[in-house]
């Protein structure tokens, strides 16, 4: 279950603020995940509408009663499962091919059973051992059976379909609300080529049933696969490129030193500045521009405090909207 909770009163929050009188606390994201031993996937608990604050922990597909497993899980892809088999020194390096494997901050879950992996121990490995691990990986990666992972993905989608329909409908209705006071000429999607901005693009496009302008912030440091995806994406979407053609990242590193927590020049030079220039060219006479960002509150403690709608602190005349919110 994913819901917004008031950290002061520990009650569910429907909007952006607690309903208790005088409480201005920002809601935090609360996630509850259960494990279905029958379907072998994590399941988001659902609200029981009959009983206030009661959560249902039954799998909607098989009806199995599920046990609490974690607050946050990420699927482990086939390549990582092979690497885990090597690190756990399994005799059969493809032993996890058919296993549903998930990762949390505290360890890995193999068909719901937790096993811990010492990152500290891995980081202290001699380079020679790492080379041997890489050799084993390279010898076996082509023999991975992906059918188990593909089947798991389908089971996960089926078991959590109700939840995704719910949050998708909420997000689309929220986005459509901005269409009442803004035209398509006043808005754009900030597109990075990542999964979050892709989902945001899909939501915005479905909300308005029309093509919306996308701006791709080219930092010049993107992976080749990102540029390839951007080119494919641009065939069906209007994508503009915001790029600083005058500066070179490596050269600036030589001149002023690499960017760090105390000297964060990279975003200003290669992202904010380039996007500001593009906005001035595309939205010349616009007083305010609406921007849909692919940012999720659950990504970090700092982002959990972001308002869903806010004025950009870096780019003038820009209103930023977090379309996904709790997705």
Model-derived features: positions:
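Nucleotide-activated chemistry modules centered on ATP-dependent adenylation/adenylyltransferase
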Residues: 1-190, 195-327
